[in-house]
Amino acid sequence: MGRLNYSITPEGRFARAMGVELPISPKHAREICRAIRGMKVEAAERFLQDVIALKRAVPFRRYNRNVPHRHGLVGWPAGRFPQKAARAVLRVLENAIGNAEYKGLEKERLVIGYANTKKGRTFRGWMPRAMGRATPKNQETVSIEMILTEVR
C-alpha cells in the first residue's frame, strides 16, 4: 500500500482524521461526504444516525441513475439510505471529534470543513460457477479524510 497523506492543511485551529481502505462503496462514500460537508459536527452526527436508522435519505447528486425519489429531500429528489457507508463515515467523524477534544477544541464550534474520498485498493476475488468457470468478485475500498475546523 502506498503512503496516504492529507490533501490540504488548513489555517487556524483544526482537527483531522482518516479512514484508510474501508470496504464500502466509493459512490456511496462520495455522496455522503458531499452531503455532510459544511455541516456542524452535531448536525452531521444526527444526519448519519438518521441515515443508518432509515429516517433520512442521502441526496444522490452524481450517481443517481435509476435512483428513486425520496420524501424529505429538499432541493434534490433522488436519494438512498447507504447504511454501511454511513457507519464508516460516522466512525471517521467520531475519531476526528476525539482528536479535536484532545487538541482542546470546543465541540459546539466545530464544522466539517473538508470531507473527501479517495479510491483505495481493489481486492481481487473469484466466485466459482458451473462448468469450471469463475466470475470475478472484487472488493473495492475507499479512504476517507475529514478535517474539522473551529469557527468563531
Swiss-Prot record:
Molecular function via GO: rRNA binding; structural constituent of ribosome
UniProt keywords, alphabetically: Ribonucleoprotein, Ribosomal protein, RNA-binding, rRNA-binding
Pfam families to which the protein is assigned, alphabetical: Ribosomal_L22
Cellular component, GO, one term: cytosolic large ribosomal subunit
InterPro entries assigned to the protein according to its UniProt record, in alphabetical order: Ribosomal_uL22, Ribosomal_uL22_euk/arc, Ribosomal_uL22_sf
GO BP field: cytoplasmic translation
Assigned protein family: Belongs to the universal ribosomal protein uL22 family.
Protein role: This protein binds specifically to 23S rRNA. It makes multiple contacts with different domains of the 23S rRNA in the assembled 50S subunit and ribosome.
Subunit (UniProt): Part of the 50S ribosomal subunit.
Record protein name field: Large ribosomal subunit protein uL22
Species this protein is from: Methanothrix thermoacetophila (strain DSM 6194 / JCM 14653 / NBRC 101360 / PT) (Methanosaeta thermophila)
Biological classification of the source: Archaea, Methanobacteriati, Methanobacteriota, Stenosarchaea group, Methanomicrobia
